[in-house]
Amino acid sequence: MGNLFVKKPQITEVDRAILSLKTQRRKLGQYQQKLEKVIEAEKQAARDLIREKRKDRALLALRKKRTQEELLKQVDQWVINVEQQLTDIELTSKQKAVFESLKQGNSAIKAIQSELDLDDVQKLMDDTADAKAYQDELNAILGEKLSAEDEEDILAEFDNLESQLIVDEMPEVPTKESEESEKLDLPDVPTKTPVASNAEITPAESATKTKVLEEPLPA
């Protein structure tokens, strides 16, 4: 149902001219084919007449052939002219389309520019410049460049801190005192024969010991 209300494209004078030229080109092409057939036929007739020793008729056929060839050349030129005309129309149509596009683009630019207030644009540019100047000044205060001497001191301090960290992370070297403290806490080696306690002496050992003590020493 929707197709019933579609508006047909309007045929312009350019469309009619293009259609006419294409029709003429098609007719000229058909005429070329006809002339080529006539030329070939006259050529074949001349061969046959020469074979029959009919020189006059053979020459007449060749004259007709030449006439048709000249006409074919003229038709070829007409076809070239038609093709050139079609090319010019197509090029001109494209140029017109480009011109219309440029015209619409120019109108769009003017419409956008009409919505821009020059005072607002100038104010925006001034605000942007002020903000940039403030930021540059702030960066200059917070990030002043250091002198060469300051840079050398910073590098030296960095090397010092790095060396300290390396030393701190290394395991400690044991000293003599720490080695002695780490020795096992063993008892001293006895220098005298250990004497057993009375509780550990048996009755037999006690009697023997008493007897020995009671015996007189030899004179």
From Swiss-Prot:
Example of a GO cellular component annotation carried by this entry: endosome
Positions with biased composition (Polar residues): 194-209
Annotated coiled-coil segments of the chain: 20-60
Sequence segments annotated as region (Disordered): 171-219
Keyword field: Coiled coil, Endosome, Protein transport, Transport
Cited function: Component of the ESCRT-III complex, which is required for multivesicular bodies (MVBs) formation and sorting of endosomal cargo proteins into MVBs. The ESCRT-III complex is probably involved in the concentration of MVB cargo.
Protein name as it appears in the record: Vacuolar protein sorting-associated protein 20 homolog 1
Organism per entry: Arabidopsis thaliana (Mouse-ear cress)
